[in-house]
Regions:
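Walker A/P-loop NTP-binding motif
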Residues: 6-23, 41, 156-158
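Walker A/P-loop
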Residues: 1-13, 144, 170
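Post-DEXD/H (motif II) to motif III coupling segment of the RecA-like Helicase ATP-binding lobe
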Residues: 129-135, 142-223
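Conserved Walker A/P-loop ATP-binding site and its immediately adjacent core
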Residues: 23-47, 61-66, 173-177, 266
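C-terminal helicase lobe and adjacent C-terminal extensions/tails of nucleic-acid helicase motors
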Residues: 178, 232, 243-309, 333, ...
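Conserved interdomain linker/interface between the two RecA-like ATPase lobes of SF2 helicase motors
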Residues: 188-269
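A substrate-engagement module of RecA-like helicase motors
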Residues: 42-107, 111-115
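Conserved two-lobed SF2 helicase motor
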Residues: 101-118, 311-326
Length: 619
């Protein structure tokens, strides 16, 4: 957590590439946003690496919207290369295809592309070939659930069979998952840990040191714990009832400062924003996943400019957000308020508290974490319960100390929640906890079984038996997915969604939200069409159910709407196949309204997308 994991991984990659004569890396992250965020950093590293060896390297950003990334566009066909330059980074149109992109020397993308190497599907051999000459680096490993872990473990096992180095990064990884992934790699090599050797490795797999480096050396597991120790930071933990929030913020920010509020759902974030903006006005800002992509990028940039490293900080600010604030954003809060969530994620959020060495406003010199949403009866907020389950919330609440010493306490706290050690509960909640524990176990089992039955690639077999194990039967019972997005859906246990392009009506035409310029006559312009293609937001299957009963009927309605209103888009490569919706301006003209079946969609730059049905907010 803030101790240079990325730099360490890239240094390891350089050594491994040299030792094993490999050509590049694959750097995988949980989301498109985190992939975009680290892409310039990896491009700069790879440019220097290629230059040091006097060669060109082909680099690619790999996710569904990579073509819209400005740096990726600059790299296309060697924009960085001139006649006098003999090394560096470029890309090539040949590698631009979805199937061939993985063959580039250096690839940054969403982790899905790595997980797909464990899914039976067409072109699987090509995907494996793409990984065969790379060091694989996967960041934020703690962010993947039990369903994705099945594909992650199998993919790691195949990398072990090929002898491909894999570097896994996390500040808050439960030790059980650490052991499982190490075991998977060794099994791939045909060197799994035997039962009689487990005692020998007990101290390694049970270690709660931080920082910690665990690695395989042939068939042996080794560990390094003797790193330079940074001084522990003491974070004070306090319980906060939400009805005291405004009063608490008034007191905390009396002399200025930046408060972060991280909650578990978009709906809660929007509700708090509407409450607090009445008291604190323009000092309040909001960030979550339900903004148009371009708006979210703008908001993230403003956030980094205001409270990132070496930023000129505002006198007073309140930043409200969801889980997007806990992943890969190098921002700093003077005080942090958070919803209760599982311990590993809670510590990720704490990583944004007093992150940088700066002078703090009076009264905020000590890092304090306020936790909302705790329940003495273990009846947690509905959204938190749905996302994380009551079992992990209950254990986190029970085991959360009044003071956290970072980084010393990171691993012990995470392990205490995930190791299933029995906890003493009062009689009044004992049965509630038992029920939550049982539900958690069933949920994990369901996710694991579903993933294993979801076209999971079989284990690698090192012994050659042409009559039994061969490429001809490799993909028996595989499935042909009609799009890459549908393939991705098989390796993520995520809710289905519909991606739409959202624009505002202006007169008889349409344009971008907040711009008040009609661009409907400029769709044939390459740059305009590309900018339109960036105005996307995903509508969840829940919205589709409220609108038309199910997601398929919603898609069919949107397709008909586009044939009637946006037919010209089908002639433009950037927009062909896209689903657009045109919002009607409301009152202030900053807010747009769109009627989608039985629901009303409202959108504006400050609060994002809201969904109403019968005058009640639904999502």
């Amino acid at each position: 957590m803030g101790c240079g994991k990325t730099e360490a991984a890239l240094t390891a990659a350089e050594e491994l590439m040299a030792e094993k004569q490999l050509d590049g890396i694959f750097f995988g992250l949980p989301t498109q946003a985190t992939s975009n965020g680290i892409f310039p950093r990896i491009e700069d590293w790879f440019d220097k690496f290629a230059g040091a060896y006097d060669k060109f390297g082909i680099m690619k950003l790999m996710h569904g919207k990579a073509a819209l990334n400005e740096l990726q566009e600059e790299l296309v066909d060697g924009v960085h290369v001139d006649e006098e330059r003999e090394s560096g980074v470029l890309t090539s149109q040949w590698f631009a295809g979805k199937k061939t992109a993985i063959l580039s020397d250096a690839v940054v993308g969403t982790v899905d592309h790595f997980l797909l190497s464990a899914l039976k599907q067409k072109h699987l051999a090509l995907r494996h070939l793409g990984f065969s000459k790379k060091v694989v680096i996967i960041d934020e490993v703690h962010a993947y659930d039990a369903y994705m872990d099945v594909f992650l473990s199998r993919a790691v096992e195949w990398m072990g069979a090929y002898g491909i180095p894999v570097v896994l990064l996390s500040a808050t990884l439960p030790k059980g998952i650490r052991e499982k992934l190490i075991q998977a790699y060794l099994l791939g090599q045909g060197k799994g840990i035997r039962t009689r050797d487990k005692k020998k490795y007990a101290s390694i797999f049970q270690s709660e040191a931080y920082p910690l480096l665990t690695y395989t050396d042939g068939g042996t597991v080794r560990q390094r714990r003797d790193f330079t120790k940074e001084e522990d930071k003491c974070v004070v933990v306090r319980r906060l009832e939400e009805n005291h929030l405004e009063e608490m913020l008034e007191t905390l920010l009396a002399n200025g400062g930046v408060a972060g509020i991280i909650v578990n759902t978009v709906g809660r974030a929007q509700g708090l924003f509407e409450r607090l903006v009445k008291v604190f006005g323009r000092d309040v800002s909001l960030l979550h996943a339900k903004f148009i992509d371009t708006d979210r990028v703008t908001k993230e940039k403003v956030l980094m400019d205001n409270i990132g490293k070496d930023a000129k900080r505002p006198r007073r600010a309140i930043v409200i957000g969801t889980q997007v604030l806990e992943q890969s954003l190098d921002i700093d809060f003077d005080v942090l308020i958070t919803d209760l969530c599982p311990m590993d994620l809670l510590l990720q959020r704490v990583g944004r508290l007093h992150r940088h060495q700066i002078t703090r406003p009076e009264g905020l010199s000590i890092p304090i974490l306020y936790v909302m949403g705790q329940s003495d009866t273990l009846s947690f907020e509905e959204g938190a319960s749905a996302i994380y389950g009551d079992y992990l919330l209950a254990r986190t609440q029970k085991l959360l100390p009044k003071e956290i010493f970072l980084p010393r306490d990171i691993s012990p706290l995470v392990q205490s929640v995930y190791d299933d050690t029995e906890i003493h509960w009062d009689e009044g909640v004992k049965e509630t906890y038992k029920s939550a524990k049982k539900k958690h176990a069933i949920n994990i089992m369901k996710k694991t079984n579903t993933a294993q039955n979801q076209f999971l690639l079989r284990k690698p077999h090192l012994k050659i038996k042409p009559d039994k194990y061969n490429l001809i039967g490799w993909l028996d019972t595989s499935i042909t997915f009609d799009s890459e997005e549908n393939a991705f859906a098989q390796v993520r246990d995520a809710e289905e969604s519909i991606e739409v392009i959202m624009l505002m009506k202006y007169g008889t035409g349409y344009g971008y939200f907040g711009k008040k310029e009609d661009i409907s006559g400029q769709v044939e312009n390459y740059k305009v069409a590309k900018e339109i293609a960036k105005q996307t937001l995903k509508l969840s299957s829940s919205i589709a159910r409220f609108a038309f009963g199910n997601i398929q009927k919603t898609i069919e309605w949107l397709e008909e709407y586009n044939r009637e209103n946006l037919y010209s888009w089908q002639q433009q490569p950037w927009l062909k196949g896209s689903l657009g919706i045109l919002f009607e301006p409301v009152d202030d003209r900053k807010t747009g309204r769109f009627y989608l079946g039985d629901v009303i969609l409202l959108y504006n730059y400050d609060i994002g997308l809201q969904v109403f049905q019968n005058n009640k907010k639904k999502i």
